[in-house]
Amino acid sequence: MSDYLELLPAVDITEGRAVQLAQGVAGSERTYGDPVAAAMRWQEAGAEWIHLVDLDAAFGRGSNRELQAEIVGALDVQVEMSGGIRDDESLAAALATGCRRVNIGTAALEQPEWCRRVIAEHGDRVAIGLDVRGRTLAARGWTKDGGDLYETLARLDAEGCARYVVTDVNKDGMLQGPNLQLLRDVCAATSAPVVASGGVTTLADIEALMELVPVGVEGAIAGTALYEGRFTLEDALALTRGGR
């Protein structure tokens, strides 16, 4: 386990643009320009990770694969790639970009046998995205229910999943603060590290997440708050890293 909270600024892409959605709803996006420039801006501000999402692939309406590869190639920092990774071909393409790890979401729910094999073959280059409403998982770009969170977590733990990215869908993009109780509950149910996503709005939210590092929260994804200027990445990193 890490002894500090890793911050992962998000770069979410749709139709070649950097966007942020409200509660993951297609059509709710606010646009923030060129995703390559956004990723470079976060790197220059001191980020050691970028959370890179292809929303078109997640919604099954196309892909931004070449653009994702361009972004990974332009960066010197580590990239966690997400969105539409559901079969051997899309997984191979994602890994071939040189990203450090991929997030698998829907496929972990709809194709458990494939997911088991991928976890066994790729180890900590694979994280499982658990997108949650209450106790229920959301799939297919958060448009379909995907079963019980804790039953799925137990199955994935037994298969050796190295890491979970846990998103409270109702919090995502809403600037209302993270769901700390959900994160505590997930950390209590698994020994694997957890990356928190959804709701980070203020530096106080980051401080609250830092308090969960000892129970298993390894990192936090920040998106809308950064793009809307609620705090700067430099200030957030100074907070999480302390004297590091």
UniProtKB/Swiss-Prot annotation:
Tell me which EC number(s) this protein carries.
Answer: 5.3.1.16
Q: Which GO terms describe its cellular component?
A: cytoplasm
Q: Name one GO molecular function term.
A: phosphoribosylanthranilate isomerase activity
Q: Which UniProt keywords apply?
A: Amino-acid biosynthesis, Cytoplasm, Histidine biosynthesis, Isomerase
Q: Where in the cell is it found?
A: Cytoplasm
Q: In which pathway does it act?
A: Amino-acid biosynthesis; L-histidine biosynthesis; L-histidine from 5-phospho-alpha-D-ribose 1-diphosphate: step 4/9
Q: Where is this chain primarily localised?
A: cytoplasm
User: Which reaction does this enzyme catalyse, per its entry?
Assistant: 1-(5-phospho-beta-D-ribosyl)-5-[(5-phospho-beta-D-ribosylamino)methylideneamino]imidazole-4-carboxamide = 5-[(5-phospho-1-deoxy-D-ribulos-1-ylimino)methylamino]-1-(5-phospho-beta-D-ribosyl)imidazole-4-carboxamide
Biological process, per Gene Ontology: L-histidine biosynthetic process; L-tryptophan biosynthetic process
Q: Which residues form a coiled coil?
A: none
Question: What residues make up the catalytic site?
Answer: D12 (proton acceptor), D131 (proton donor)
Broad EC category? isomerase
Taxonomic superkingdom: Bacteria
- Which family does the record assign? Belongs to the HisA/HisF family.
* Alphabetized PANTHER family for the sequence: 1-(5-PHOSPHORIBOSYL)-5-[(5-PHOSPHORIBOSYLAMINO)METHYLIDENEAMINO] IMIDAZOLE-4-CARBOXAMIDE ISOMERASE
Could you identify this protein by its name? 1-(5-phosphoribosyl)-5-[(5-phosphoribosylamino)methylideneamino] imidazole-4-carboxamide isomerase
Species, as recorded: Nocardioides sp. (strain ATCC BAA-499 / JS614)
Q: Name the gene.
A: hisA
